[in-house]
Amino acid sequence: MSLITDIYAREVLDSRGNPTVEVEVYTEDGGFGRGIVPSGASTGEHEAVELRDGDKNRFSGKGVEKAVANVNGPISKEIVGFEVTDQIAIDKAMIKLDGTPNKGKLGANAILGVSLAVARAAADELQVPLYNYIGGSNAHVLPTPMMNVINGGAHSENKVDFQEFMIMPVGAPSVKEAIRMGSETFHALKSLLSADGKATSVGDEGGFAPDFANNEEPLQYLIKAIEKAGYKPGKDVAIAVDVAASELWNDEDKKYKLRWSTGEEFTTEEFVKYLEGLVNKYPIISIEDPIDENNWDDWASITKELGKKVQLVGDDFFVTNTEYLAKGIKMGAANAILIKVNQIGTLTETMESIEMAKEAGYTAIVSHRSGETEDTTIADLVVATNAGQIKTGSMSRTDRIAKYNQLMRIEDQLEGVAEYKGINSFYNLSADAREEISNK
């Protein structure tokens, strides 16, 4: 193989118009790779540090020239000369160079940009698709999408406490058909909202954020939209929600407050019962962050209570970190992890988290961030790891659609071996639970 000869970073913009880091890697034999780093709006307390400039006179302090300088300076000096295929060694060298537990010195956005660009350069050098380079010849599972079609909580200005309401085409025979079903349901939902005089403008992730009266009204609209599109709720299209419970938790009172809707307050036990009531009433197959990210014992309790019949996803709870995931597995807390490459900061560490989850029987959902770009790496990553589920936004906005289009390309390339598991991608749930969802 050939050596890395040049690494170059620049400041570009993400889907929200905020600065982010783009990195290009070049090899001596003409290999080229480019990676663009996403960013989140709501971030976990323990995420790797996204280095921003802090200069209020430039991009309101959100510039990333410091991170860019770190790539073009110390990181480039360290990594130029490495074999481009030495991904693990390159990632570990950058982690060592940074020397902090949260990548706060060089910036996770600087390190990740290089990590992603190196992988693409290696794939280009070998003349193979990125998913094939990362996952080898066994990469063949196309993911069941989580499509965020209604936004609430911190992602909106309506009276809805939950952050995201998603549809999952669990009954589709292929990812191409899953995307079609999602698109048809999305447009049916838009038609219903418009007919009722509700706003149909879209948010950061392409979902609608009209004014609703409470947390159940969006669920009711989703049921109507699924049916209007010609599908059966549960059997064909299931529902997933992101509660983002840390946004609702009051650490002083030790209660969850529905701060955007009714103002009701719940003890942890009452809140779990509240969520269980929704699971029993609607075809909800997945709940993300149902408990505050720092309440480990409560996470174990809700998993014991609901973990056999609904996917319980740790996002802010695990932040794609193997240390937190290992603790969760030991405690029996959650049964799934959301995988965000910029939460941990390198491709190697991301892969380690996915592998650890799968070995423990946890599902791994590869995810976008609210501040996305045209980079489609996560589409290749989810196939490379056979993770089985992806969360990459709604059926609008090019930054989201780019990932769906890439999945359809990959499915075409894997003709004859591609597998779409749908409801069976929820291997963390009992067979009875999967059957029950289909019959709701």
UniProtKB/Swiss-Prot annotation:
Its EC number is 4.2.1.11. Pfam families: Enolase_C, Enolase_N. One of its GO terms (cellular component) is cell surface. One of its GO terms (biological process) is glycolytic process. Mg(2+) binds at residues 242, 288, 315. GO terms for molecular function: magnesium ion binding; phosphopyruvate hydratase activity. The active site is at 205 (proton donor), 340 (proton acceptor). Binds a second Mg(2+) ion via substrate during catalysis. (2R)-2-phosphoglycerate binds at residues 163, 340, 369-370, 391. Its main location: cytoplasm. Pathway: Carbohydrate degradation; glycolysis; pyruvate from D-glyceraldehyde 3-phosphate: step 4/5. Catalyzes the reversible conversion of 2-phosphoglycerate (2-PG) into phosphoenolpyruvate (PEP). It is essential for the degradation of carbohydrates via glycolysis. HAMAP family: Enolase. PANTHER family: ENOLASE. Belongs to the enolase family. This is Enolase. The gene is eno.
